[in-house]
Amino acid sequence: MPAKAVCVLRGDVSGTVFFDQQDEKSPVVVSGEVQGLTKGKHGFHVHEFGDNTNGCTSAGAHFNPEKQDHGGPSSAVRHVGDLGNIEAIEDSGVTKVSIQDSQISLHGPNSIIGRTLVVHADPDDLGLGGHELSKTTGNAGGRIACGVIGLAKI
């Protein structure tokens, strides 16, 4: 059954991100735009809670129902919510989001509906950086924008 979701990002930067899944076994297509990022890569993750009462910090850790180490989108071992990086080509411009991911879902136990999408200040090292935070957060820095992922009309 097809499903769609949307997330409106708010914070120091802003944007709108859409999620489309044709059926429960299909990958999720993530698309949209983020405005106001500094030039370079920025960690892009689904966090465990849809709680933004204390800004982005109340969203909890990365969505990780399998209790794995942090990794990149193509890593064999990763959090479900590890979507890697989005890259701003220029300061404060529009950054296009175009990702296809088979770990997140809009159905079942790996559903991201009601969870928070977070854009981070720094690049995600995909768990390979050797920093003490590499295996938990990708050492991606502060949370500069976030929003709750909600169901959208098909």
From Swiss-Prot:
- Entry cofactor note text? Binds 1 copper ion per subunit.
Q: Keyword Metal-binding, does the record have it?
A: yes
Entry's Pfam families? Sod_Cu (PF00080)
| Location of the protein in the cell | Cytoplasm
Q: What is catalyzed by this enzyme? A: 2 superoxide + 2 H(+) = H2O2 + O2
Q: Which cysteines are joined by disulfide bonds?
A: 56-146
The record's listing under Gene3D superfamilies reads: Superoxide dismutase, copper/zinc binding domain (2.60.40.200)
A GO cellular component annotated for this chain's UniProt record is: cytoplasm
Annotated Zn(2+) binding lies at: 62, 70, 79, 82
- Family of the protein in this entry: Belongs to the Cu-Zn superoxide dismutase family.
Protein task: Destroys radicals which are normally produced within the cells and which are toxic to biological systems.
Subunit arrangement? Homodimer.
Protein name from the UniProt record: Superoxide dismutase [Cu-Zn]
